[in-house]
Amino acid sequence: MKSFTATALAALLAQQAAAHSTFQQLWVDGTDFGSQCARLPQSNSPITNYNSNDMRCNIIGTRPQVKCPVRAGGTVTVEMHAQNGDRSCSQEAIGGAHHGPVSVYLTKVSDALTADGSTGWFKIFDDGWRKNPSGRVGDDDFWGTKDLNACCGKMNVKIPSDIPSGDYLLRAEAIALHAAGGAGGAQPYMTCYQITVSGGGSASPPTVSIPGHFKASDPGVQVNIHGAMTNYVIPGPAVYAGGSTKVAGSACSGCEATCAVGSSPTTSLTPPVSTSTPAPGNGGGGSPGGCTVQKYGQCGGQGYTGCTTCAAGSTCNTTNQWYHQCV
């Protein structure tokens, strides 16, 4: 019995670890920008302290030196996968029955390269929950994360047409609720993208602070999805009037359905020139434009398109074929 229990526990832990994920790539009106403007997290683990400033943009491993150009009224497509640099559809974007809502926020900043996310945030997108008439419990119902899995990790998000032009952080968040029956059990996964919006208006959406956009005791955060459900309240504020929502369980559309790696030429962005020391052994011969990766950030790997030069005092180490890290 002890042997069985230990084996089952080990299998469960392995499944949970494999199910961890990160938002990694960004498409803009169908153009693939890869991870160039994504503040890639150090790991694919969730943030468990809801009061931490890490709730804003995660524990950042790679801070890019570029911003993705986005037009007001356009559509961006965030992309999530389990392993860094792995954009295949052979495994779920967020597996292990990690069901829950997906939300996207914006915050207006003076410079997306240096902003810390302490400015006010407003929600521009939700994909939450819908009852499955054929299901018995919440696990069987339709969820935002299931839509991510159905669309190879992609989720279309409309940029409001009336927000002011300028720099923003765009924050994608998925909340896994498989262990949310007790306080603190919900698992938020988030990534921030650095963008510059053009052609905007003069709207001033109401904002909330992050951390603080939800509490551990909120009904959409502490919830048992393993029993029958009759309703669900998505955590955080309401979606701004100029934003959009997706009905959970609806079909993939637009870029969700048609955008695949190689279907659109990846647009390369030019970062500001900086002085850096090339990192040996990364196979890239240095980074384009002179950008640098801070210690413990990603510097290479299959499918990776960001900076490959480590900051002085660290070198690019090959962890596996998908992930090289400055150490």
Swiss-Prot record:
Residues where O2 binds: H178, Q187
Domain CBM1: 291-327
Biased composition (Low complexity): 264-280
Cofactor(s) annotated in UniProt: Cu(2+)
CDD domains membership: LPMO_AA9
Known uses: Lignocellulose is the most abundant polymeric composite on Earth and is a recalcitrant but promising renewable substrate for industrial biotechnology applications. Together with cellobiose dehydrogenases (CDHs) an enzymatic system capable of oxidative cellulose cleavage is formed, which increases the efficiency of cellulases and put LPMOs at focus of biofuel research.
Gene Ontology terms for molecular function: cellulose binding; metal ion binding; monooxygenase activity
A GO term from the CC aspect: extracellular region
Key words of the record: Carbohydrate metabolism, Cellulose degradation, Copper, Disulfide bond, Glycoprotein, Metal-binding, Monooxygenase, Oxidoreductase, Polysaccharide degradation, Secreted, Signal
Function: Lytic polysaccharide monooxygenase (LPMO) that depolymerizes crystalline and amorphous polysaccharides via the oxidation of scissile alpha- or beta-(1-4)-glycosidic bonds, yielding C1 or C4 oxidation products. Catalysis by LPMOs requires the reduction of the active-site copper from Cu(II) to Cu(I) by a reducing agent and H(2)O(2) or O(2) as a cosubstrate.
Name listed for the protein in its UniProt record: AA9 family lytic polysaccharide monooxygenase B
Native source species: Podospora anserina (strain S / ATCC MYA-4624 / DSM 980 / FGSC 10383) (Pleurage anserina)
Gene from which this protein is expressed: LPMO9B
